Amino acid sequence: MKRIVFACMALLMGTATFAGGNGPKPKAETATIYIYRTGSWGAAANNWAMFVDEKKVCKLSNNRFIKVEVAPGKHRVSSKIGGIELLKKVTEIEIEAEAGKSYFVACNVKQSLTRARLEMTEVTKSSADKQMEKMTLDKCQEEAETK
């Protein structure tokens, strides 16, 4: 019985080691949240201010992504567009982050006659990989990394 338990544990540890793929690995004590915005011609001029736990991270542009390292626990990702607050809806999503894991938030612009909002959805890594394939890091994070 001990041999079976030991064999199962060894197998699980071995598969966990190789499950991550070739992408960037988050630090073991933090989690990584990738927030990306797919292209939308009608809303291409709008840059949405992205917040994590009410702290402004970046203004997210079309076909770009941002990367945020967070401590384990609950985190609220929200967005706002600039200008007058009349008829504007703040959108948000909550992520329960675990250390060493990556999370992906897809952002899509939804427009009506009176307002535009950024709809956020948590997606799997495989879905995000397909959508983020040709995206680059948003300029606001590029500038922060070069300073």
Description of each model-found segment:
Residues 1-4:
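Positively charged n-region of N-terminal signal peptides that target proteins for export
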Residues 6-9:
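Sec-dependent N-terminal signal peptides
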Residues 14-16:
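N-terminal signal peptide c-region/cleavage motif recognized by signal peptidases
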Residues 20-147:
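Short loop/turn and low-complexity linker motifs enriched in small/turn-promoting residues
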